[in-house]
Amino acid sequence: MAAHDLTQAICQNLDPHLILPLLDHCVDLDIYNEADLKRAKMQVLSRTRLIEQALELADATEKKDLDARMRSISEEEKTWEKQLEPVFEMFENDEVLSIIEATKNKDSLLSELEPYGFTENTADLLYHGSKFYFDRGQYDLAHGLLYNYRAVSTDDKLKFTALWGKLAAAILSGNWQTAQEDMYLLLEYIDGGKNELTAVEQLQQRNWLLHWSLFVFFNQPDGPDGIVDLFMNKETCTNAMQTIAPHLFRYATAVAIMSRRKKRDVMWEFVGIARQDKDLGDDPVVGFLVSLIKDFDFVTAEEKLQQCREVLSKDYFLAEMTDEFINTAQLYLFEVYLRVHSRVSIKNAATRLGKSEDDAEEWLVKLIRDAKLDAQIDPASGEIHITKPVTTVYQHVLDRTKNLQYRTYVIVESLHHLHPNGAFHHSNSSIPALFRRMMNEQLQGGGKSNKKGDYKKGDYKKGGDFKKGGDFKKGGDHKKRAWVK
């Protein structure tokens, strides 16, 4: 199943330190050559100062070079400890912290802190020192240094860079609440109009953030639900995914299926996107959804579901949710099956579910009750008979047109983005043609539309008015994220 493994695609958008957990996960899987994994890990470690880990993998020749580098790093660490000692003492002073919180104008902050030993060089020490300790794997210390750097720095570009670093440090230290706050703060900056990013840079930054967000969302109890809201933000994130990283739709689709009662409408958005990108439909998770609710091809849906079990069990982010996904997907499959069939054989259902007939009957009864279907069991034939509700013409029209107002709004917004100054004419024949096409798709059941998924904002403040944050930029031969020196 290496063909469906996303490790390589995801690693191209991560900092080297974030790549290491994924490579360690791959060691336990029987899909990559062990020697290739070892070589890949050594290449990643060579871009860090994690010499101890590299020594465990190195051969005799490599160890000589690593021993020399280890001695150099040890001397460098002593130098940083000496340089940062007065800085640590200064930030342990409550008066200093009070001044930082109270001073709104960062330009005047330097003069306010001068009596306590703060100089122009202090901010540089915080920034570069955090980079050193991050590379050494001391993520908590690096996070604290970056927090203080962002509190006193007046360099907006470096503060943005530091925000990426702070997010990475929070992820690697398992501080998920702070990581989530940093993630949304980064998104706010990227999407804001005050940054100096070009449209292409914004697109790439969003792409990186979406990949990094997987660590945040899948390591919190209620985190996965937020992934759909973020990924399906049409004005920003959805475009980045479709353009650069369509493989990420696997995660949003999987979460939507697992929480389908709350995310039912958004499933049609995934189907619509998959129709535009045929390769996306090859993904087992997305393919399952398309086969089920678009094609009503239950045989293919079952085949895709079997693939999902194997693929998800080896996915770094979804492995622990495999059973939950399979159980929910089975429920969804049979619910759709019951809605389009008038009778279901209990014996056939038992075979497909891998249950006894009694257990299958009990399982189906519970499903019918939860789905609020009108059905009866016929003991003589061993079948469940489903009574289809009769829908009046008026109700049918209402159901088909209830989202037209929102779809019209989307069209107007799209035209506004194409012509921000309102420079389009109502006589333009392409506009009513586009409107009619969208209307026809809605009336013909071409898919349901969900409202714009606004990502949630968190409370980014900690103990004062200055904000938290951190940042990497992408670099390296393989386009891995790295600090800017």
Swiss-Prot record:
It is found in: Cytoplasm. The keyword Heme does not apply. Residues 444-485 are annotated as: Disordered. InterPro entries: eIF3e, eIF3e_N, PCI_dom, WH_DNA-bd_sf. Residues 219-391 form the PCI domain. Residues 451-475 have a biased composition (Basic and acidic residues). Residues 476-485 have a biased composition (Basic residues). Gene3D superfamilies: 1.25.40.570. It comes from the Eukaryota. Its main location: cytoplasm. The keyword Mitochondrion does not apply. CDD domains: eIF3E. Pfam families: eIF3_N, PCI. One of its GO terms (cellular component) is nucleus. One of its GO terms (molecular function) is translation initiation factor activity. Keywords: Cytoplasm, Initiation factor, Protein biosynthesis. GO terms for biological process: formation of cytoplasmic translation initiation complex; translational initiation. Belongs to the eIF-3 subunit E family. Component of the eukaryotic translation initiation factor 3 (eIF-3) complex, which is involved in protein synthesis of a specialized repertoire of mRNAs and, together with other initiation factors, stimulates binding of mRNA and methionyl-tRNAi to the 40S ribosome. The eIF-3 complex specifically targets and initiates translation of a subset of mRNAs involved in cell proliferation. Component of the eukaryotic translation initiation factor 3 (eIF-3) complex. This is Eukaryotic translation initiation factor 3 subunit E. It comes from Monosiga brevicollis. The lineage of its organism: Eukaryota, Choanoflagellata, Craspedida, Salpingoecidae, Monosiga.
